[in-house]
Design a protein with these regions (language model features):
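Extracellular glycan-interaction surfaces
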Residues: 2-11, 15-79
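Residues on the solvent-exposed faces and adjacent turns
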Residues: 5, 58, 113, 165, ...
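Short sequence motifs at beta-strands and strand-loop junctions characteristic
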Residues: 45-48, 103, 143, 230
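Residue-level detector of short, conserved catalytic/binding motifs and their immediate flanks
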Residues: 52-54, 63, 107, 161, ...
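Flexible glycan-contacting loops in extracellular carbohydrate-active proteins
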Residues: 75-105
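Extended recognition patches within non-cytosolic domains
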Residues: 105-131
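Beta-rich interaction/scaffold domains
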Residues: 127-303
Length: 303
């Protein structure tokens, strides 16, 4: 038989072929990567629970194992696969022995009619990793962009990403967004991501629409996003910048209790009850402003 185990009892990749006939204990004839008798092969690498590519190339006189893009090694054999006979059974996730079933997932199984070279194994691995990275690459909803975009420079498995833009005056290759002026039309541009891994590349395009300023809407959104605690017993941190780059200033209705900066000046004595204060935020953006009041209670002293 030929047997592939992503992780044996020692957590190592195992890929072996029986090199002779021993009906009572065929496992003692295993040759290859992590065989039962270590003298008949080489130790496989420790593997993990992440997705990985396991490749075995069997020729008339050798078995070679690969883990992702790394060649583990080659072990000479004398038994040919054709000697296994006909009417053979093949299992995925099940052993020929009375072992427990495989607990994991299998994404894809490929069988070739020829022996792959190391170059081919690496090429397949890199292209598969890049395809998965491309499929998973997202920059969010691009139908009505109002803010700078986060464009990743690196992805999992060592994939690097570079970006190009069709119109840098609207969105730069770093994701900096310049919105059209209020009353103008939206701008639609293309961002192109080039994903690279060890000399292999794929590209993915994103169509991005940048909408013009609408100061009333934008300030309303910025104000809606602004939130404060309703009851406080210690100083609060007041943001000075809001959504879309709006600036925020603050004004307290009673600075003898709570300052404009959010610092508690005095708390009521225990038993006097909480002191109510209104803290008003003024959000400003491109010459327009909107106010948002917050009713806050400064807690009385505990004792």
């Amino acid at each position: 038989y030929w047997l592939l185990n992503p992780a044996n009892l020692s957590g190592q990749m195992k890929s072996v072929i029986t090199n002779s006939v021993n009906e009572s204990a065929p496992y003692n004839t295993e040759y290859g990567i992590s065989p039962t008798n270590s003298a008949y092969g080489i130790a496989g690498p420790k593997t993990g629970s992440d997705w990985a590519k396991y490749t075995t190339v069997i020729t008339e006189n050798s078995i070679t194992g690969y883990y992702n893009d790394q060649k583990i090694g080659t072990v000479e054999i004398t038994n040919k696969v054709e000697n296994f006979g006909t009417d053979l059974f093949a299992y995925i996730g099940k052993s020929s022995y009375s072992d427990m079933f495989y607990k994991g997932s299998v994404k894809e199984v490929k069988i070739y009619d020829g022996a792959q070279s190391y170059k081919q194994v690496k090429s397949d691995y890199y292209n598969e990793v890049l395809k998965a990275a491309k499929d998973g690459l997202s920059i969010g909803d691009t139908s009505a962009v109002k803010e700078d975009l986060t464009l990743p420079a690196t992805l999992e498995n060592g994939v690097s990403v570079s970006w190009e833009t069709s119109k840098a005056s609207v969105i730069t290759a770093e994701g900096k967004v310049t919105r059209p002026e209020e009353g103008k039309t939206s701008e639609t541009i293309t961002l192109t991501a080039t994903l690279s891994l060890n000399g292999y590349t794929v590209t993915k395009e994103f169509e991005v629409t940048v909408v013009p300023w609408n100061l009333d809407e934008d300030l309303a959104e910025a104000a809606a996003q602004l939130k404060l605690a309703k009851v406080i017993s210690e100083d609060i941190e007041l943001p000075e910048e809001g959504k879309y780059g709006s600036t925020i200033t603050w004004k307290s209705s009673d600075d003898s209790v709570l300052s404009d900066a959010g610092a508690i000046v005095s708390r009521p004595e225990s038993g006097k009850g909480n002191q109510k204060v209104t803290l008003t935020a003024t959000l400003s953006l491109n010459g327009k402003s909107v106010e948002k009041p917050f009713k806050i209670e400064v807690m009385e002293e505990f004792y």
